[in-house]
Each structure stands twice: as C-alpha cells, then as structure tokens.
Amino acid sequence: MRAFIVFLIILSTAASLAAVQPLLGLTIPRMDSSPTLDGKLDDPQWAKAAVIPYLLLLPDNGTPTQPTEILVFYTPKAVCVGYDCHESQMDKIISAAKNRDDDVWSDDSLELFFRPGTDPAPYYHLIANSLGTRYDAIYKAVGVDDASYNPDWTVRTSIGKDGWQAEFEIPYSAVGVTGVNPGDVWFVNFCRGERPVSENGSWSTLVRRFHEPENFGRLVFGDADTPIVKISTFTGLPNGMVERAGEISNPDSQPIQVRLNTTILPDGKQFDRIAPVAPNSMAKFRLQDQTTGEGQLTAIFEASVGGNAVCRLIRPFNVPPVRSRLASLTARLDALEKGGAAVQALREKQKAVSKAALWIAESPDKIDSVVRALDDLERAVLTAEFRPKVKGAEFYAWAANPWVQLKPADLPPTGDLSAISTQAYRGENVYAAVNVTSFAEQALDLRVTAGLASMPESNIQVHTCAFVKEDGDSKSLIGDALPLADQANRLIVPQYQTGQVFLIISTKGLQAGDYKGAVSICPTTGGDSQEVTVNLQVLPLDLPDDPKPRLCTWGGILNISWAKTDPMAYLKDAVDHGVNVFAVNPQSAVPALDAEGNITKPIDYTAHDKLAKAYAPYGLISGMYSIGIVYDGWAKKAGIAYMSPAYRKGFINWVRDWIAHLKSLGLGYQDFIFELADEPNGKDEFQFFMDIGRLMREADPKARTVLTANFGEYDRLKQAAEVTDIWVPHNRVLANEASVKVMKDSGKEMWTYVCAGDSKRLDPISYYRFLAWQAFRYDLAGWGFFAHMWWGENPWESKSNAGKHDATFSSVYPGANGPVTSRRWEAYWKGHQDFRALHLLKTLIAKGGGSPDALSKAKAVLAEAENAPAKLEEMQRSGIPTQAQAELLDGLRAKVAESSIELSK
C-alpha cells in the first residue's frame, strides 16, 4: 500500500445543527482467520483491525492517566478483541483471582459486554485479569445475572514493563448467535478496571456503571474492504480549539471519499470536511477548528463513507467563559461610566485583559492567567457597582442559599439580595445564610445581630463559616465548617474575601404565623450597618415524629481520638440529628477459645457495656463491622479450621453468650442487630456471609441480621434472603429493579446507605439531603452514610495520600465545647425533616380528606416528589449547581405543604 498523505488544517466557521449525542460506533473488518493467541498484539491481523484509541473515565467521561487502546475484527467463526493497557505502576496491579468465575472484576481486569439483539437483554458479560483468569455471565434481564453460564471463549495475556496486553477470541456461540453477516449490528462495550490509580474506563458513554446495556455502542460488521480510521489525536482545548489527527487506510481497489464530521454539543455546531483516499492507500489528516462555545462542551467525531459511519468517538472538554465574561464586564464598565463613576483605572485593566485574551487561540496555556485577571477585574467592577448601594461601606451583606458551599472568592450575583423568605412546619429547623463580601484593603471585624419579632432569642443559633481544605490534594477552600459565633457574635472577613453568617432557626414552640426580622451586620469599630430582612412563615402544620426512620452513620462516636474532651456531646449531636442505630464493635466482646471451640473464661464485657449502656436509650445497638470476620480471626489464632466442628461450636457459644448478656442489660431482640460481613461482594466473601449467617440462625433464630450489600446480583440476593432480616443495599443498587424486587418481595425491612471518602467534596444536596428523598421514593425504613465521625484523621486536617483524595469521612469537626456542625451534616438533617413532611402528605392522601380537586392535586405533588431523586441525579450529571438543586427540593416542599394544608381542612 502506498502512502498518500493529506493534511487538512482547518480554521473554519461552523454551521449550526440541532444534535443529540449519539451512541458511539465502530465498523470492524472481516478477516479470514484469528491470530495466534499468545497475549501479544504482534500478529499481522491486528495491524488491520478497527481501533478504539482511548477509553473514557466513569462516570465523568474524563481522560484516564493510564491509556488503553482496543483493536477489533471478526472472522467467520469469532469476534477478536485485543487490549493494549498502559500502566505506570505495574508492581501494583492486582491479579488475585485464579479460578474461573472468581471475583475477577476486583482485579486489574478487562470487561467485554455483548448485546447481539436490539432489546436491553439478554446480554453477555466476559471478564479477564492479567493472568487470563476468566469470568462470564449472561444477563437474561437487566439486573438478573446467571454466572453459571460458562461458554467456550479464549483469552491470552502478556505482561510487560509498562503495561499488559490481552487477546480475546469470542466464538459466536458464546454470545448466543450462530454467525454474522456484513451489515449486522451488535451493541457492545469494552471496559477496563485499573486498580493502581483506581480508574474505570469505558468505550461507551455511561451514566453510572458498566452495566448499562441501553448505552452500549454500535458495533457494525463490515467486510474485508472496510476502511480503517486510526485516531492519534482527538482533544478539546480550553481555548475552544478542537484537534483531530489520524490516518485512514483504504484496502479497497476503488478510491473512497471519507467524510470527517465533528459536531459540538450542546449548541450543535458542525465542522465538516471530505478526505479523499486512493485505492490501497493511506491518507493522514489533521484538523483544527475553533468553536465559539463556552462551558462544558462535547465534541463528537464521525468518519463515514457513503453515509455509513466507520467510527464515532466523543471527547468532553471545558472552555472557560473568557469571551462572554469579558463582553459582560465591558458592558458593565460602560454603564458605570454613563452613571458618572470614575472608571479610568478599570478601563486600563480591561484593556490589559482584552489584549491577553487575543492570544488565547494560539496559547491555550495562557487561559489560567487570563481567568485570574478576569476575576480581579470582576471584583474591581463589582466594588465600583456596589459602592453607591452600600453608601461608602467597605462590605456588602447579601442573602445566599444556605446549602451552597461558600468559597472565599465568591461574589454576589446581580439582582435584589436584600431579603430572605422561607417557610417551615412547626417543630422544624429553618436554615438561612447571609454572605458578607469585603471591599476593604484590610480584614474587617464585624458584629452580627439576628432577631425575629415575637421569637425567643434561644430559637436562633448564629453560626459563622470556617473555611477548610476541600481534600488532601486540593488548594481549594470551602466553607463547610459552621462553628457557633462567639459571645460577641463577631464575624471576621479577610480583605477582598467573602464570609458568611449561617442561621439555624428552631420553630419548636412557635405558633403558626409570620415572623419578621433581620440579620444586621455592623463594624465593631463603628460605622453604618447593613441589613438583610428575614420573613419566616410558620405553617399550621406540625412536623410529625413518625415515621422514625432508622438512621445509621456507622463510624464510632464514643471512641474517637479527636473527640475525647466530651464524647457524650458528640453522641447528643448524633441523636439530635436523628441517628438511632449505633455500632458496637465486636472487638469489645472477645471470647477466649481452646482448640475444641470452648470458651475458656468469662467474656469481659466491660468495654462493650460502656458503649451499649450509652447507646441503648437512643435506638438499636448494632454488632457492626463483620462479627463473622472478627470471629474468624480469633478462631484462626486458636488453631481452629474454618467451619470445623470446633469453629461452629465456638461461634454458636459466643453468640449465645453475647445475646444472653444483652438480655441481662434489659435489652430485647428488637434492640440489637448483627452484621455478619461488611459488604460481602466478592465470591468468597459472599460464601463466608452465607456460612456465618446459617451459624447465626443455628445459634439463635430470633437474632436479627443485617446485610450491607454493595452488589446487586440477582442470584446472590435471592440466596442472601435465607439469612438476612434487614436489607441495607448501597443506594446505587436501587437502580436495579430486579434486585430491589428480590428484597421487597422478601417482606423484610429495607434501608439504604452510601459510603464515599473525600466527603468534604460531596454535595450537601445531591449526596446528603438526597438520601432521605431516595428512601421515600423506594419506601425504605431507613438510610445512612459513613460517617458522622471517623476514627481516622482530625477532620480539620486533610492530608495528601499518594495523590489520592482521601481526606476524611467525618461530617462534624472537633470544637472546644463539643462538635462543630457542617453544612453537609445539616443538609442530612434537613433531609430527615423532608422525609417526615413527605410521609405526612402520604398519610393525609390515604385518609382521603379534602376536596376531590385537592386530593387529585396532592397525588400529583406526591408523584413529583417521588421523581425528585431521578431529577436530582440528572441535574448532578448535567453539572447543574447546588443552588438549583436546593431550589428544586424547596419548591417541592412548598407544594407538599400547600397540599397537606388543603387535605387537613
């Protein structure tokens, strides 16, 4: 084949096209035979294969640091797939699975999904690790897997210095078909689980997980003359430049015209060029186009011949809004000048920024400095705009959404920000925030006064906002910690920064009606004060005490090293925020065993009883943290083999002794539960869970057990029902309808939970408050997250951990007199109040009160509330900010209140 090189360097005006992001696509060539399978991609067939040049990170479609290239073709008998996996830390890859259908996905692994039909199921799931260990399953319905399905297919792997490779040969019979013809279409996905850096990559664009058959890409079976497009570059730069480069191979004896189309979403701009490729030749291309769009954009590249797509790729990228901000600031300067303001110095800044912005097209690396200059200019313009409003004051007080994590450089938006208007049920907490932006050249020492007419001062807590590191690696600060103001209610705001007054207003003991007042900010050194008015409407509805959801935050409370000054204050804080399930570590009740499994001396329950007696008045005592695993360790130390007669005897006697002791403390079976194995998602871990569960049933059939399930496999959940009394699936499992049905059909109690480190980065609305709405949506009895308090680092500190975000799990901070609350922790409690308000409406609907129109409207409101979790997830995926998410829930709460009042008449 001779090389015919075509360079297309294009800076063009884009055409407009309304577009919807399509599925990814790839047309693969037909070859006569498979390669010699040795795990090395050096056979000549691979050089002619279709190429997937990169994977996208799940779930944000980012770029992995460890690249993966995938090669695909087919033969009369099989589909052949090759993986070339780059890895910078080969000494840290995981290859624990040795046997077929072990937990291969927990290793560094490659996952292949095949859906030959047009329906979401059945689809086939194949996995291999770097040892060539295989896992396979058929999903006969979405969420319903059968891991006993073991078809014939082959994988070979090879390990190198800087990565590893794999060759797959998948006969058609392995995926339920007898053969294929040119033009046939399958829906597939190719994925990689990389462990040293913890990167999950996918060819298809997914929402949350690999198992999304509706989002699998299109695999088209071509013929021997199918052109091959190999992309070497596909990037979107922060200056709006989109670069594509690669080569097109034409194995046909006829020339072809390849259409190279790039569409930019969401605005639908198109860049379109034709690349001619001579017979049996290769043409190189390089395309450069600049979009005028800004914000989060997606470039979709498609190469097609005769209207048939050969390949389709996407590349998300972000363009900071330099041009639009500059235009807006210029217009604001013009308005200031017309109003008589002295703006000459600002004009000079604006000209300097405009000059720097001219170089953006050639130097995308200059963007950061231009953005910083824009930030400085905007603050200066804002200062000039607000000077008349604040009558020469050095600060501006403005109403803010209390759930938005404040940053020191935040600026007030335009519009009237002088008033806060909110409503609440009787007995509910109300949250409000007033931000204070400094225009001074020195730190401001301010005093806060907050009051509402006819409301006792004790009903209002004044907090300030303390900035903490967002995580161990970030230099970014967020206003998460909310310490109580000092006795003088002082607020210190550094120069040119923004601080916050955070109010927690209790409506307990208040009558229904309007409560009006203000938050006043005044310099301690004298001068004019500023006010933000507050109007609180207390509704003629009592927030019900029932239902009382089960709330658990797992981490210890009374045994945290950084909370030793007054641990009972932290327990009170947890209880005040609804926590009523408490973990008692089984290490506090250790039995001494002999080789026959006999308990050789009385168990010392001293440490256990200290916790149990403290927690028992407030809710369930939970033998958490895998009592089975803890016992297994003790048994091994005594030389007892797993599940031997001595093992069984020791466990049963220990559990019976423990339960008898709990009863001696005045506790009944309704007061305690046992977790057998924490998150037993692996094959061996799950079998262990089942074994220990059966021993628990033998020890005491009345003792209740709980399963924290971060897996959604249908068959496993059906098995687990035998030994599970309380289901606690991870909240992502709730998206699996088949799994939820298994748990619901068991008739047993069901909660949900989440667990994520780096918790300061988690959104107060879409992570913390969200849980209660999700629990209501699925009619759950409780929910939880890890953790209210974590025994790791002091939450005021965030230490870097080998480049990974591993800050802290805690939701409160240690203070001089007990816990300092956080925005996240209060959002969690707000969700608890939402949950009870939603249940009140549900109860009123069931009673059938009110007019037919009111009842019909209430049912529609309830349906809207049940859809709120899905709406929040979509908003989060779309990058819609916290304030809009909070406004969605607050708007729904207002509708719920209105309908509840109507049905109460």
Task: Please describe what each predicted stretch is.
Residues 726-800:
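Catalytic-core region of carbohydrate-active enzymes that cleave or remodel glycosidic bonds
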Residues 437, 474, 505-507, 516-523, ...:
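Aromatic-lined carbohydrate-binding surfaces of glycoside hydrolases
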Residues 226-235, 311-338, 534-566:
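Low-complexity, Pro/Ser/Thr- and charge-rich linker/hinge segments at domain boundaries
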Residues 282-284, 291-321, 437-446, 450, ...:
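Extended acidic/polar, glycine-enriched regions
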Residues 19-317:
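Structural preference for beta-rich elements and adjacent junctions enriched in aromatics
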Residues 236-245, 417-440:
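Contiguous beta-strand segments within globular domains
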Residues 332-384, 632, 639-647, 651, ...:
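Catalytic domains of carbohydrate-active enzymes that cleave complex glycans
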Residues 268, 390-416, 439-503, 510-511:
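Surface-exposed binding patches on compact interaction domains or structured appendages
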